[in-house]
């Protein structure tokens, strides 16, 4: 397999096919149970109307509708009304309806299973939120899939993109614990595609293990030059997963639309935020994130109940355990900087522990939030926004 072939396929897919994908459609998974936290959805648009072609004989039936919903919407600006059709004898029917592209056999039989579906469903019932930062933040839950039906000896690329669910901007109403429409969406962010770092690879390699997009990061920095996915905060997005067959033919760009297949799992849609809004989402992330062990070691009653930006009931519990209070071996005071503090000084020192000060008490010299656990060489980044006042982008959780 030549590098030029892979490059051609990537360019053809990105420039031709992906640009014409719509937010709706794909090969969706089963809808998640429970009520939608964003309220009732808008009714689906009516099915397209197919008018008979002007060149067809009188009385001849027009083109039949497709047997199932075609996964991709027409490109932006494409003519959809009958008035835009060419007129006169011999006019083409192409403007009236675009026939579905027959998929290459290498991708037609591919199927995908979403991993951790039960967890995604649980988040979806609450209204999933994903943190976006200037530096980029990984998703949790991580998007992971299991693949079936690939040609073991064929080469495939796996990639993801994110499309807006609607044209609205949202805000969270804390008094009602619900999301409300705040207005029209902000201008669209630059569309980007995230290729799995193992792409391209043989079908046998993709199918033998779970495929994880744990390197994918979300950012709200419009000038990002690190290749992260750029999203608008307080907007809803739908992740999409694409399987692309690496066609060895020299003119493979001609077959770009038939060489890929898209999968959409509605339970993975989320709202991009800079700090968690729903405290139940915060609790569920703490309970289910393997890198949040330090938070789970505390009493669940210490978890934030009435969440608001800057609230710090959870971190305060840990900070108090590290404050310079009197111990049995030091009944009359506490050592600080080589001398003993009297009880009054201890009380004054403790009273100055504002939320920002408490975070500094918990953060070691390496910028790692120390929750009393051994700090490994590489701490997994963990989002403390919405939990910790005075947080910094470098905070990590041990």
Curated annotation (Swiss-Prot):
Matches recorded under SMART domains: TBOX
InterPro entries assigned to the protein according to its UniProt record, in alphabetical order: p53-like_TF_DNA-bd_sf, T-box_DNA-bd, T-box_sf, TF_T-box, TF_T-box_CS
Keyword Transcription regulation carried by entry: yes
One Gene Ontology CC term in the entry: nucleus
Pfam families listed in its UniProt record: T-box (PF00907)
GO molecular function: DNA binding; DNA-binding transcription factor activity, RNA polymerase II-specific; protein dimerization activity; protein homodimerization activity; RNA polymerase II cis-regulatory region sequence-specific DNA binding; sequence-specific DNA binding; sequence-specific double-stranded DNA binding
Biased composition annotated in UniProt, kind: Low complexity: 29-38
Ranges of Pro residues composition bias in the record: 40-50, 60-69
DNA-binding span(s): 119-297
Transmembrane stretches, start-end: none
Gene Ontology biological-process entries: angiogenesis; anterior/posterior pattern specification; aorta morphogenesis; artery morphogenesis; blood vessel development; blood vessel morphogenesis; cell fate specification; cell population proliferation
Region Disordered, residue ranges: 23-72
Gene3D superfamilies the record matches: Transcription factor, T-box (2.60.40.820)
Keywords of this entry: Developmental protein, Disease variant, DNA-binding, Nucleus, Transcription, Transcription regulation
Subcellular location: Nucleus
Subunit structure: Binds DNA as a dimer. Interacts with DSCR6. Interacts with NKX2-5.
Summary of the function given for this chain in its UniProt record: Transcription factor that plays a key role in cardiovascular development by promoting pharyngeal arch segmentation during embryonic development. Also involved in craniofacial muscle development. Together with NKX2-5, acts as a regulator of asymmetric cardiac morphogenesis by promoting expression of PITX2. Acts upstream of TBX1 for the formation of the thymus and parathyroid glands from the third pharyngeal pouch. Required for hair follicle stem cell self-renewal. Binds to the palindromic T site 5'-TTCACACCTAGGTGTGAA-3' DNA sequence.
Disease listed for this protein: Haploinsufficiency of the TBX1 gene is responsible for most of the physical malformations present in DiGeorge syndrome (DGS) and velocardiofacial syndrome (VCFS). DGS is characterized by the association of several malformations: hypoplastic thymus and parathyroid glands, congenital conotruncal cardiopathy, and a subtle but characteristic facial dysmorphology. VCFS is marked by the association of congenital conotruncal heart defects, cleft palate or velar insufficiency, facial dysmorpholgy and learning difficulties. DiGeorge syndrome: A congenital syndrome characterized by a wide spectrum of characteristics including parathyroid hypoplasia resulting in hypocalcemia, thymic hypoplasia resulting in T-cell immunodeficiency, defects in the outflow tract of the heart, and craniofacial anomalies. Disturbance of cervical neural crest migration into the derivatives of the pharyngeal arches and pouches can account for the phenotype.
Protein name: T-box transcription factor TBX1
Lineage: Eukaryota, Metazoa, Chordata, Craniata, Vertebrata
Gene: TBX1
């Amino acid at each position: 397999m030549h590098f030029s072939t892979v490059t051609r396929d990537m360019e053809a897919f990105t420039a031709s096919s992906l640009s014409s994908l719509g937010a709706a459609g794909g090969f969706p998974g089963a809808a998640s149970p429970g009520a939608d936290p964003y309220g009732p959805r808008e009714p689906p648009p009516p099915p397209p109307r197919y008018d008979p072609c002007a060149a067809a004989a009188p009385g001849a039936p027009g083109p039949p509708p497709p047997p199932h919903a075609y996964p991709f919407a027409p490109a932006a600006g494409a003519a959809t009304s009958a008035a835009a059709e060419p007129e006169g004898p011999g006019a083409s029917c192409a403007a009236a309806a675009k026939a579905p592209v027959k998929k290459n056999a290498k991708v037609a039989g591919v199927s995908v299973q979403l991993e951790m579906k039960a967890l995604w469903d649980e988040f979806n019932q609450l209204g999933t939120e994903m943190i976006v930062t200037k530096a980029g933040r990984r998703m949790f839950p991580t998007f992971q899939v299991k693949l079936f039906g690939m040609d073991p000896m064929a080469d495939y690329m796996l990639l993801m993109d994110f499309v807006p669910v609607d044209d609205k901007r949202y805000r969270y109403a804390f008094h009602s614990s619900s999301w409300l429409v705040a207005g029209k969406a902000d201008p669209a962010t630059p569309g980007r595609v995230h290729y799995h770092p193992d792409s391209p690879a043989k079908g046998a390699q993709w199918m033998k293990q779970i495929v994880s997009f744990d390197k994918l990061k979300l950012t709200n920095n419009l000038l990002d030059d690190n290749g992260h996915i750029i999203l608008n905060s307080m907007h809803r997005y739908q992740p999409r997963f694409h399987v692309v067959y690496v066609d060895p033919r020299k003119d493979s760009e001609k077959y770009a639309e038939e060489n890929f297949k898209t999968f959409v799992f509605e339970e993975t849609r989320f709202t991009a935020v800079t700090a968690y809004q729903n405290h139940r989402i915060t609790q569920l992330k703490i309970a289910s994130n393997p890198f949040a062990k330090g938070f789970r070691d505390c009493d669940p009653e210490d978890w934030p109940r009435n969440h608001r930006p800057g609230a710090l009931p959870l971190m305060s519990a840990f900070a108090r355990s590290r404050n310079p209070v009197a111990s049995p071996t030091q009944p009359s005071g506490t050592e600080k900087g080589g001398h003993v503090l009297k009880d009054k000084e201890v009380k004054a020192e403790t009273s100055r522990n504002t939320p920002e000060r408490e975070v500094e008490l918990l953060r070691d010299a390496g910028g790692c939030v120390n929750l009393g656990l051994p700090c490994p060489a590489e701490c997994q980044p963990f989002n403390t926004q919405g939990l910790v006042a005075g947080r910094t982008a470098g905070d990590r959780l041990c």
